């Protein structure tokens, strides 16, 4: 057994001990390796002490695993942390519905109680997320002037039928992922769509 193998084995043992022994984990929360600190968030007591850790990934783990941590992090300076809060906790998503970051707002749109407030958002990616999340909203948004929104509608096969001749190749490419439609799009004018068609017909559909 060489030195590197021993080192890897020791790391595995340490990781296993962290997730099974809270006292050991508490002694590791100041570890220099952020991945070790992230493992410590397995325990709520550790996570609460790591909630303001300088490493974004550690804070994300805190927010994802523990509601008490997420409630301290929903206004975190990093949008990826706020996004985790919005993704996992509906009441925090409600507080983030007007977040300055469009990815956070798009995540809020996954909640049925909040999506109605976002269908007219200024950001096309946010409106696209609304269309992707709820079929009944996609039906209302299918004639949007933004191709990104129409692309979101196209993930629904019954709506994609109405979009296979869309002016945007990006929208048609989404339509081409549906196997039942791909066979009708073999002669699409854009090679990028035809690539998707070929791939779909040779593999599986949505």
Predicted regions and their residues:
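Alpha-helical scaffold segments
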Residues: 2-206
